Design a protein with these regions (language model features):
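Phosphate-handling catalytic cores of nucleic-acid transaction enzymes
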Residues: 1-428
Length: 428
């Protein structure tokens, strides 16, 4: 899990400025759900022409005692303005509830107050309460930070199992509808569009177990994952900087830019970058022949692009040249985490033949000598747990893309990723 790019977008640089180096990559991912939650009815158009809002969900998976709390303080600072407004509205709601209960069964009860936008929700909120908060949020995002991923189970509701996973999937999908119909007059009957950004932390073991039943159903591909590398035994304790008024003051203009944005925002540079990164992922999928990687990369690219859009808006709708390297890093890191934590389990779930390996995907071309035979290509595929039948198509793609050249019926020569380090241009 590589360290951050040298030159960071100013907002990210600020948000990790008080964080010890070992935690910086995790914080750089984990700040996005709360940043995105400041956008209200702001839409961006992806390269498939579908409009998205900044739906960002983040899970930090790291060992016990790794310092998962490192994300808390930056998020507290980002959420400060939303919490202030929530506080006022929670007070209004409390006053109304007290008034209603004190009046007993009298008829002159005041209606529930208007405009009760309360964005930050309790981690253990029930399903009906979630639907009601969503309806009252008037197009704003709900947000929560879970100290442990299984706190999500409160959202299961009494109905079918796995409703919390359905909520995760729907939150990511534009134009979703979710709700419940109840008969009782006091019950919540609402259909809402879920706008829900969240952060959760968990140990690697618990995280794997939590998602083990839904490996192929979509939540994993819609969530952004990050981690903290294991510390050396006996290493010095990381020391944090101080979050002071100067930090808040520097953060303020970015938050204000997010809050005042509206409507469909066009960011041509983010659009171009999404196209470029999609191609880069497709290239790696062709070379590693990993279907799991390819499938995960589609939504990972949407997540990375949404982060680019959030940075763009926070920066006053100005693109900065540091964005590209950061977003590329962010995408590669997200995919590396997904492959490391879930790759082989997803493969097993998809393939009953049980052939798998626990490493992430590898570039098969790199594993072959500079000149190789058809049989060697078959062998490399099988060593990596892939079938022999796909060899012909793989070689055809490599030749078509200019990675390799066919010399005879059975012999091939590498043009790229050669052991001698010299790339050859096939047009020469």
């Amino acid at each position: 899990h590589s360290s951050l790019p040298k030159r960071l977008p100013a907002l990210i640089k600020l948000l990790v400025s008080r964080t010890p180096d070992v935690y910086k990559p995790a914080v750089a991912h984990a700040v996005f759900p709360s940043l995105g939650a400041h956008l209200h009815r702001v839409r961006f158009k992806y390269i498939d022409n579908v409009e998205h809002e900044a739906t960002l969900m983040n899970v930090l998976m790291a060992g016990t005692g790794a310092g998962k709390d490192c994300i808390s303080e930056p998020i507290n600072r980002i959420m400060a303005d939303i919490r202030r407004r929530d506080e006022d509205n929670l007070r209004r709601e409390r006053e109304w509830k007290n008034e209603v209960t004190s009046k007993g069964a009298n008829k002159d009860k005041r209606q529930r107050p208007e405009g009760l936008i309360i964005q930050e929700i309790d981690a253990d909120m029930t399903n009906p309460a979630f639907v009601m908060r969503m309806a009252e949020a008037d197009g704003h995002f709900l947000y929560t930070k879970l100290n442990e991923i299984d706190q999500f189970d409160a959202l299961k509701g009494t109905g079918r199992a796995g409703q919390q996973f359905q909520i995760m999937c729907l939150a990511f999908d534009p134009g979703n509808r979710y709700g419940q119909t109840r008969v009782g007059a006091q019950s919540v009957t609402e259909k809402v569009t879920i706008r829900f950004n969240w952060n959760a932390a968990t140990t690697i073991q618990k995280g794997r177990r939590y998602f083990s039943k839904v490996l192929t159903d979509g939540p994993i591909s819609r969530i952004n994952f990050c981690t903290i590398p294991e510390r050396e035994i006996g290493a010095d304790m990381p020391v944090y900087g101080t979050y002071d008024a100067a930090f808040d003051e520097e953060l303020r203009p970015y938050i204000e830019n997010l809050v005042k944005a509206q409507g469909l925002i066009d960011c041509p540079q983010a659009y171009k970058l999404a196209q470029k990164l999609k191609e880069e992922c497709a290239d790696f999928a062709r070379l590693s022949q990993s279907r799991v990687y390819e499938n995960l990369s589609f939504r990972a690219n949407v997540i990375a692009w949404l982060k680019a859009c959030v940075l763009y808006v926070a920066n006053g709708c100005q693109w900065d040249k540091t964005f590209e390297d950061f977003i590329r890093w962010s995408l590669q890191y997200d995919l590396a985490c997904k492959m490391e934590f879930f790759g082989s389990a997803i493969e097993e779930a998809q393939a009953a033949d049980g052939l798998h390996n626990t490493r992430g995907p590898r570039n098969l071309l790199e594993l072959l000598p500079d000149e190789f035979t058809y049989q060697q290509a078959v062998l490399v595929r099988q060593q990596e747990g892939k079938n022999a039948e796909g060899t012909k198509n793989m070689l055809w793609q490599w030749i078509h893309r200019g990675y390799a050249l066919q010399l005879t019926v059975d012999n091939y020569k590498k043009l790229k990723f050669r052991k001698d380090g010299n790339d050859i241009d096939k047009n020469r």
